[in-house]
Amino acid sequence: KSVRAGKFTVEFIHVNHSIADSVAFAIHTKMGTIVHTGDFKIDSTPIDGEVIDLARLGELGKEGVLCLCADSTNVERPGFTPSEKVVGATFMRQFQNCDERIIVTTFASNVHRVQQVLDAAAQCGRKVAVTGRSMENMMKVSTELGYMKVPKNTLVDINKLKGLPKNKQVIVTTGSQGEEMSALYRMAFSTHKQVE
């Protein structure tokens, strides 16, 4: 898909990233094409089934690119980054083998990772509570837009966790980078109002 923006035509090219529906831009100008990838990852088995459009990126390369602005975390490391599905398999192993409460922290924007937490919890008979404003907002919006499918009877209010055995609890929260006001930080310092 592409749109006109003044004298430019901007083409959207699907890429994989922790944020659903990420795209690279091919900006077609009279001087040549500028490709801006944004942060991306090559994942041949992404959670949503939508693989990066390497074919289109290759076509653009053959046509000639005036400027490439590319960003990919850990690009300087040799080898490949594992698929996000590897994380889901790890969740399953941990959820099956843990006899206590599980707390998972991730970026609120990582919808696919949260989906894998929900799926693993449901398969292991655990209930999931969400805490952290950005995580709560992401869950609401991504569910409404169809990016996330919450397994039936899996999600519970954070205040209802106290009535469940700890081996049936999963908390998904913000704070994966140690932010001082995040829910995880407050849990770690026993200042979270709903989690002991």
Predicted regions and their residues:
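His/Asp/Glu-rich metal-coordinating catalytic cores
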Residues: 1-164, 176-194
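Short beta-strand segments
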Residues: 172-174
